[in-house]
């Protein structure tokens, strides 16, 4: 596996890569990331993964400085997974002018759901992904459904800007007890880790209610919020939305997604379940 640190080297490598799949990450890799790599390997001749902890998508009081940097372990995992190249730019390499005057501004959905609690987050995501796409120039890129709102923003950006890159959604990787795999799971204490699957159980409860024909989304959402709060969670949101647009869902709609974000101790967990009736 080649390790590429500059934009010039990445562009030179890309010229001889053939059909190229790309997996952008912030490092601290786990089995969920490797699931994205496996999906990429199935679809292209070469796979490049990037590791870049993007300051622009962290808000005030968030964990940019504390975010785990595990470069050596990440390299070993990627090499074992058959990745052809790792793009590992410095902050100065990716943001050469230091200040970033031009940004990619997502639509109104960036201010809802996670965006309501993390102002500017999706602007930072859309901007860095655009920069990485321009540098790597992949044929396709794999994104996990666990970050459902992020996936929607990237898909909308690609469609609206007429980008030729194919976006491949990959199902959420889960632990045996249902907890969605996430780098932030490492922040959980042993007691919190035992409690964490409650989030997925509540999403599953809402899914079961929807599949049974319930149209009272508000009641299902409130029951989940109440259960989480009673167990000591701080709930940001639990919402049923349209799966394809993330707009507010109305009674009778067939393609839904249930999304939630809540804090367990100091750790913010997100998850979702698609419901196609």
From Swiss-Prot:
One of its GO terms (cellular component) is cytosol. It catalyses: (R)-pantoate + beta-alanine + ATP = (R)-pantothenate + AMP + diphosphate + H(+). (R)-pantoate binds at residues 57, 150. It is an enzyme of class 6 (ligase). Pfam families: Pantoate_ligase. The active site is at residue 33. InterPro entries: Cyt_trans-like, Pantoate_ligase, Pantoate_ligase_C, Rossmann-like_a/b/a_fold. One of its GO terms (biological process) is pantothenate biosynthetic process. Catalyzes the condensation of pantoate with beta-alanine in an ATP-dependent reaction via a pantoyl-adenylate intermediate. NCBIfam families: cyt_tran_rel, panC. Homodimer. Belongs to the pantothenate synthetase family. This is Pantothenate synthetase. It comes from Chromobacterium violaceum (strain ATCC 12472 / DSM 30191 / JCM 1249 / CCUG 213 / NBRC 12614 / NCIMB 9131 / NCTC 9757 / MK).
